[in-house]
A protein has these predicted regions:
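Charged, often Cys/His-bearing segments associated with DNA-binding zinc-finger transcription factors
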Residues: 1-39, 421-450
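Basic, short loop/linker segments at the boundary and entry of helix-turn-helix/winged-helix-like folds
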Residues: 17, 21-66, 101
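Short, positively charged, Gly/Tyr-enriched micro-motifs
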Residues: 49-120, 395, 400-403
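Catalytic-loop motifs flanking and including active-site residues across diverse enzymes
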Residues: 55-58, 101, 213-216, 377, ...
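Short amphipathic alpha-helical "interface-anchor" segments enriched in bulky aromatics
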Residues: 79, 272-312, 351-397
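Polybasic low-complexity intrinsically disordered regions
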Residues: 102-268
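Long, low-complexity, polar/charged, intrinsically disordered or flexibly structured peripheral segments
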Residues: 315-360
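Basic, amphipathic alpha-helical segments enriched in Lys/Arg and hydrophobic/aromatic residues
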Residues: 368-450
């Protein structure tokens, strides 16, 4: 890979459409699959070994790395490309596996205990990156996307622990609640937790197409926390699908700042009196938790958003100040509100009143909007899975095969992310190739050539 020095650490736009043999070799070397291959060999036992499990596993990974739309296309290239064959342990053209061998291998890979070990490969790769990249996982975002799949024609035992493909439907509405767009698919839902800055997946989970996002997020978050150093996650952005009281309590217990827009549930009310204030107070809040003060001295009451000062973690309160004093303009109610106060009127809102309504980062702040825009990172990751690596092609039949295939795609995602971070950087057109400190550390951990 040729990556310029000015590119970010994970330069996804520098991915090669057709990776070189050197890139494929380094990718295969970066995948910690010893335990998985050992389990597969033990499962095979003394049976026929015409196509070793290492060859089948390497063929699966290479088919995704080289972006073949079908397995037959990858097998055809292996038959023609002797150099590529040798990378995965195939000496002759006759030793290239057949399409049905790969289909059976996917079925085995998606069964226990191999499926858990496959997920363990992903977890180890995340931990390696998290130990080397100090800010990986600090600012995160989550989302779910639909993936097309096909169901087996005949029922069989062994898939009871896996969700089966089902019909999914998602409606998009405008501000008035009218449906503007409907997306339907048959298959599964893929739930991701992604680092916003680096666009690297930290944890994932496959569920039924009609599963609710707020039901799946706790398990995805727990897996991400295991993969990252303690207290690494600072904030988590999600759409309204996770605007749930239980989710806010979960994030509060983990000391993670939620960046989640709230659902509109008030029918006729526009504002309410802040709890703890009576009818003589001029402090109110809207459904999103934005705090306002009323100027009651003017002929007609005028509502002003109060100035957000910060989150007081020790007190578990959100501090607001008189907007006129904070921003330097004159308010007719200054004498009434701020008499004898140099700093101006101060309001502290206890978050425990309603964790969902009053998050540590109020929704009306620029910081909230900036962090909420980080959700686009998940959409870009979803696009790579679907368009670049073909996870949404719908060519995989059966729950076991689908889970194995998606797990392999995620391993390819992390493997190529690791190579991007470990790639030498080019200083200008005629400049030398240099390794940064993170690249040196990664290459040393993976045993790659310095």
């Amino acid at each position: 890979m040729r990556v310029a020095m000015t590119k970010p650490l994970f330069a996804w736009d520098c991915l090669e459409d057709s990776p070189s043999l050197g890139t494929v070799r380094e990718f295969l070397q970066s995948v910690p699959d010893e335990a998985l291959l050992g389990s597969l060999r033990a499962w095979r036992g003394k049976g026929r070994d015409d196509y070793p499990v290492g060859v089948l596993w390497g063929t699966l990974l290479v088919s995704i790395v080289l972006r073949h739309p079908t397995m037959e296309g990858c097998l055809g290239e292996l038959g023609r490309n002797a150099g590529l064959r040798r990378l995965i342990g195939i000496e002759t053209e006759e030793q290239v596996p057949k399409a049905w061998n790969m289909s059976r291998f996917l079925d085995v890979l998606g069964s226990e205990p191999h499926r858990t070990l496959l997920e363990g490969v992903f977890d180890r790769m995340v931990r390696t990156l998290a130990e080397t990249v100090p800010d990986l996982g600090r600012v995160t975002a989550g989302d779910a996307t639909g993936l097309r799949a096909r169901r087996l024609r005949a029922k069989r035992g062994g898939d009871e622990d896996l969700p089966v493909p089902a019909g999914g439907r998602k409606e998009y509405t405008d501000d008035e609640g009218k449906v503007t767009k409907v997306v339907e698919w048959f298959g599964y839902k893929l739930h991701l937790l992604v680092d916003v800055k680096h666009e690297v997946v930290l944890a994932w989970r496959i569920s039924s197409a009609n599963a609710a996002d707020n039901d799946e997020l706790p398990e995805v978050l727990a897996r991400a926390q295991k993969n990252l150093p303690k207290d690494r996650i600072d904030s988590l952005a999600y759409d309204k699908a996770c605007d749930d009281g239980a989710i806010h309590e979960l994030l509060d217990d983990a000391d993670i700042k939620p960046v989640i827009h709230n659902r509109s549930m008030w029918k006729d009310e526009l504002e309410r009196m802040l709890p703890g204030h009576d009818g003589r107070s001029n402090i109110v809040h809207d459904e999103a938790g934005t705090v306002y003060c009323y100027d009651k001295v003017s002929r007609e009451p005028v509502r002003h958003p109060m100035a957000y000062i910060g989150h007081e973690q020790a007190r578990r309160t959100i501090k607001y100040r008189c907007p006129a004093r904070h921003e330097g303009w004159t308010c007719p109610s200054d004498q009434r509100c701020n008499a004898g106060k140099t700093y101006g009127k101060t309001v502290r809102v206890p978050r425990d009143i309603d964790l969902r309504r009053f998050p540590p980062i109020p929704r009306a702040t620029k910081k909230f909007e900036r962090l909420y825009k980080g959700r686009t990172a998940v959409e870009r990751v979803n696009a790579r899975f679907k368009v670049f690596w073909g996870a949404d092609d719908g060519n995989v039949v059966g729950a076991r095969r689908f889970h194995a295939h998606v797990g392999a795609v995620l391993i390819v995602h992390l493997g190529l992310a690791t190579l991007l971070a470990a790639a030498p950087r080019r200083e200008g057109t005629l400049g030398k190739m240099r390794l940064g400190p993170i690249a040196k550390a990664l290459r040393a951990k993976l045993g790659l050539k310095q």
